[in-house]
Amino acid sequence: MFRLLTHKMMESVKTASVASLVSLLVTGCVTSIPRSPENVCGIFEEKRGWFLAAKRARDRWKAPVGITMSFIYQESGYQATARPERERLFGVIPWKRKSTAVGYAQAIDATWKQYVSDAQNAGDWFPKYRSNFYDAVDFVGWYNNQSQRQLRLSRTDAKNLYLAYHEGWRGYQNRTYEKKKWLINAANKVETRARRYQIQYLKCKKKLSRWYDFLLFR
């Protein structure tokens, strides 16, 4: 009897340990910025949980890893708690922020709410946080998937996907970005980086992959 109880206790400990490990790997570190942000392989070697998250978004949304990661870089510089600067009242006093954007993907409140609602309708009731890399990268994949459907954009068209991401679907249709030279320049940077990231990723994804990776996806 004692041996049976001991065995069950050990199994419980093992299960809890595996669950903790999975959570740690998939969530990744939400406080530190990658040491080599220009090299996606370096990022994934440093933060393997991010590799798993980006690969999961690719499989789920058919989202090229290079594009997804380039969006995150452009939006937050890989800062988990990034937020827009505050406006200045009378040019001096810190005032309200320019938008409700928060986290890695700089998702605003309304769009994040829609993303969570869609996930729940699909049966995914896990809590979602904009400071969680797994959730943020999945959000980018979801958003770009919506852009493909609504705007008929190619999943590999990083520039126009980013313009739609920044301006919103209606804003993109109204071509509001045409009056924003700085935004077009940013979209060009996203496109260039996405292309470089994708080339890097294709060279290292096999080395980074493990046979048991499928067990780590929730």
Per-segment meaning from a language model:
Residues 30-52, 56, 188-218:
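Extracytoplasmic and endomembrane cell-envelope/extracellular-matrix remodeling and assembly machinery
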Residues 87-91, 181-184:
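Glycine-rich, phosphate-binding/catalytic loops in enzymes
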Residues 104-160, 164-172, 190:
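Alpha-helical segment that forms one wall of the substrate-binding/catalytic cleft
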